[in-house]
Amino acid sequence: MEIIKTLGEFIIDRQKDYPDASGELTSLFSSIRLAAKILHREINKAGLADITGAAGDENVQGEQQQKLDVYANERFKNALAQRGVVCGIASEEEEQFVRFEETKNLGGKYVVLIDPLDGSSNIDVNVSVGTIFSVYRRVSPEGEHVTEEDFLQPGHKQIAAGYIIYGSSTMLVYTTGNGVNGFTYDPTIGVFCLSHPNLRIPEDGTIYSINEGNYIHFPEGVKKYIKFCQEEDDATQRPYTSRYIGSLVSDFHRNLIKGGIYLYPTSSRYPEGKLRLLYECNPMAFLIEQAGGKAIANPGQRILDIEPTKLHQRCPLFVGSPKMVDKLEQFISELG
């Protein structure tokens, strides 16, 4: 008889790897798990309830907020505040970081950075969306209010990161710096079950993911790499397959499983890149490196080594199978 291991059991088993955690990480993940279940329920009702479409406001990025963006942000914020182990969060949907003012939260060891609903514009057309999260140990003294410096830490200081993908099934994939594991939600019993242990990205792949509609705005090195992917060469299994959903979590998850590269370069429209370093690039870079992959912003510039200077800092992102990222890096180094 096959023994099913739940997310809660798995985290408790791994707690011995972090003797200083004293159960706080278990509690923190319990909050994330709860909010994910609530969001799973609401997303599955999209189209039946009045939760799709624009909310009528813009977020700090100047992007149209969807109703589910607002809903997801509130659910995760409330869940993380309840346990007392998190002293504050920073969200892609909020201009400033959020202090948790309760006395129990002042002693919290951790801060969480989150993109509550990545790809939310796809909800109306029933395309997979996701949540991305990142956990750091605070640098300010415990017992005091959280500060901006607690959030402006380089990615290599993350102690946990992950994403939840709401697709044909709902999955939670995470790392605490000791490999990557995936858990599929079973709504009949209300638990996440270990379904993808020790995830490893293939060293090479045949899928590239980029919005080619913006080709004219890309740097020359990226244009050359796209042409390389499209050329015919039996020895390298080219032409490669182009797959782009427009939801970072969905594109990343597919490439993690099958092997591939995701590209979001700088452009004439977005000279600093479009994705957010703290909410998207850092957690995905931590995950991919733990799965045997590679993530860079520019040639020789590892995502996890970038020192952030502001909460909503943007950054180019090239992430995926290491051999594909290395090849892209060659083109950018030569042509810019």
Curated annotation (Swiss-Prot):
Keyword vocabulary terms for this entry: Carbohydrate metabolism, Cytoplasm, Hydrolase, Magnesium, Metal-binding
Chain positions recorded as Mg(2+) 2 binding sites: 115, 118, 280
KW Nuclease (keyword) present: no
Alphabetized GO MF terms: fructose 1,6-bisphosphate 1-phosphatase activity; magnesium ion binding
Keyword Chaperone part of the UniProt annotation: no
InterPro entries: FBPase_C_dom, FBPase_class-1, FBPase_N, FBPtase, Fructose_bisphosphatase_AS
Needed cofactors: Mg(2+)
Localization (cell): Cytoplasm
Domain of life: Bacteria
EC number(s) on file: 3.1.3.11
UniProt xrefs under PROSITE patterns: FBPASE (PS00124)
Positions that bind Mg(2+) 1: 92, 115, 117
GO cellular component: cytosol
Protein's pathway: Carbohydrate biosynthesis; gluconeogenesis
Record-level GO BP terms: fructose 1,6-bisphosphate metabolic process; fructose 6-phosphate metabolic process; fructose metabolic process; gluconeogenesis; sucrose biosynthetic process
Positions bound to substrate: 118-121, 211, 244, 262-264, 274
UniProt subunit comment: Homotetramer.
Protein known as: Fructose-1,6-bisphosphatase class 1
Annotated gene: fbp
